[in-house]
Amino acid sequence: MTTVPVTDIQNDLITEFSEDNYPSNKNYEITLRQMSILTHVNNVVDREHNAAVVSSPEEISSQLNEDLFPDDDSPATIIERVQPHTTIIDDTPPPTFRRELLISEQRQQREKRFNITVSKNSEAIMESRSMITSMPTQTPSLGVVYDKDKRIQMLEDEVVNLRNQRSNTKSSDNLDNFTRILFGKTPYKSTEVNKRIAIVNYANLNGSPLSVEDLDVCSEDEIDRIYKTIKQYHESRKRKIIVTNVIIIVINIIEQALLKLGFEEIKGLSTDITSEIIDVEIGDDCDAVASKLGIGNSPVLNIVLFILKIFVKRIKII
């Protein structure tokens, strides 16, 4: 038995000793087997610091058997080791073996890696459960390359470039379609209309603050449904206006006839009844009557009734 003080053991040598059967002082009694293990670990650490040592397959095999399978006469103190799962690679030329022993101070455990060089240009690595990264790399962040002001300036320039690209690709088509819809200078088919511009134009005519950017969240199917709904509402409104103008003309004629018969109380009735009142009160009924009579959206008929309504209000027919 040899008495070795604990302070003589190096801190980077990782050992796991059971404290059973040891006195509670700073001097532990270490057996010859334990001393041989410490010597072996010390030799491995020295080889790691000096250079990577290449051994023959027979020496590695005998050394592994000695490390992984201790003798039966070893003391009660147990040093836990993990046997790596390796595979045998048969190829020519005969492989050379190299063992690397890594000592981790944080995890307090030993990891082994075996590199098998198959040829000069290729190398197969057989590792244990713990994966080892030889050369870790890290991508530098923008905060290291550029300062805060530079990053903000780069973002602002990128936003300006994206806006310019977007305006250059869409402005000409949108402006052309908007001119067609607003002024009607050029005949066009319904498939050629930019439906988004038509929706925005209709919203602006009705006092709704809507822009093309607000419609970016809508899909093409939703734009088609909105455009179809607006078109149907526009046609329905035109039919109601035709029936409304007919009703106003009839009311003016009835008012003049009643005044001719001496009913002075009826005077001013045509002034009180406007298109807005008719639309609110019987607008849906006017649309139903127009649909039932087959009255479509006829611009000529609408213009004729509008002119006739103005003259009937000013001229006494009866």
Swiss-Prot record:
InterPro entries: Poxvirus_A11. Keywords: Coiled coil, Host cytoplasm, Late protein, Phosphoprotein. It comes from the Viruses. The keyword Phosphoprotein applies. Phosphorylated by a OPG054-independent mechanism. One of its GO terms (cellular component) is host cell cytoplasm. Belongs to the orthopoxvirus OPG137 family. Homomultimer. Interacts with OPG160. Required for viral crescent formation early during virus morphogenesis. This is Protein OPG137. The gene is OPG137.
